[in-house]
Regions:
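C-terminal charged capping/lid subdomain of soluble metabolic enzymes
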Residues: 82-158
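Active-site segments that bind and position negatively charged phosphate/pyrophosphate groups
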Residues: 1-91
């Protein structure tokens, strides 16, 4: 976006995006930060991992996990429309693909093994930290992840 231009229109659009994102996560008396952010906390709790990098790596796998859970409204249609893939036959796969494309276009890390962070032997402790994170209170209704579920997401992201 902006093709590298540093003009007023580009900066106004960027600022608008920042404000909309912040409104989306922070409201008076509540937050909408949820499972992806909890993963970020779990992955950065003891290691020298930048939280944004952790989010970039796990977001596609967390979304895939959410979309696979029966009876959980992960708002796939809303996400698909927001990402411009609302007409896709498989909206869940299209959302995961779109998020992956954004991450890759930003040249962010794609695998946990590429970060200076936890190793697979640490995944149980990371999963326990994710589940204990306060933002897990904001997961979609009906989602009740286990340590094994979280470890599975971490293994997929490895």
């Amino acid at each position: 976006f902006g093709d590298g231009q540093r003009d007023t229109d580009t900066f106004e659009t960027i600022l608008e995006g920042i404000v909309l994102v912040q409104y989306g996560i922070s409201r008076p008396g509540e937050t909408t930060l949820s499972i992806v952010h909890a993963f970020g906390h779990g992955l950065t709790r003891t290691d020298d991992v930048q939280q944004g990098a952790a989010h970039a790596v796990v977001a596609p796998d967390v979304l895939e996990y959410l979309f696979e859970q029966a009876g959980v409204d992960a708002r796939v249609g809303l996400l698909a429309n927001a990402l411009g893939v609302g007409d896709a036959a498989d909206q869940a796969a299209a959302v995961v693909s779109a998020v992956t494309e954004v991450r890759d276009a930003l040249e962010l890390p794609t695998r946990l093994r590429d970060l200076d962070g936890p190793e697979p032997d640490d995944f149980t402790a990371v999963a326990e930290a994710v589940l204990a994170d306060s933002f897990m209170a904001n997961v979609p209704p009906g989602l009740d992840p286990t340590v094994a579920d979280i470890e599975g997401v971490l293994e997929a992201a490895w």
